[in-house]
Amino acid sequence: VTQAVLLGLVQPALCQHLMAHGLPVVGMNAMGQPVAYGEYLDQAVYGEVGKVTAINQDYIQNQLQNGIGVCAPIAISKSGQTLNVNGDVAAAAISRLLEAEKLYLVTDVPGVMVNRHVLNKLTPQKADQLLETQVIKAGMKPKIKAAFDALKHGVKEVEITNELQHSGTNLSVEQFAI
């Protein structure tokens, strides 16, 4: 069911949204060509939930020549099972493995919010403080963790935003030494 919703509704809607802004977009979840491979987190506890362990780099690189890649957060296990993976964690893993320079984490809010204002920039120290005091919670937590994971592993910049025309919260290796 999750796979049908992600591939049949969510991914096409996101692609349409990006194309409406004049961006070249390619959906990258062909059943014959998986984007990501993964393994179960703990099948007894989480069911069909996993983490990305490898990517189909040749396929992805080929598709990216045609536009901005949009892929659903699913991975294929060694046994061929479809695994649900956290979208932010998957995006960070894929960007890291592709040695991408920039990662956009698109969300339903304009960026990391503090007192109803968007933070333009976020350092690890500030993020730790906001996480500790539970200013950052719920769905933003995995985004922050994924963003810093991507930065620690070679991605130079991450933007957390809901808009394509306006900046959200920017995290970059230039703001701090990792």
Q: What spans do the regions from the language model cover?
A:
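C-terminal catalytic "cap/lid" subdomain
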Residues: 1-178
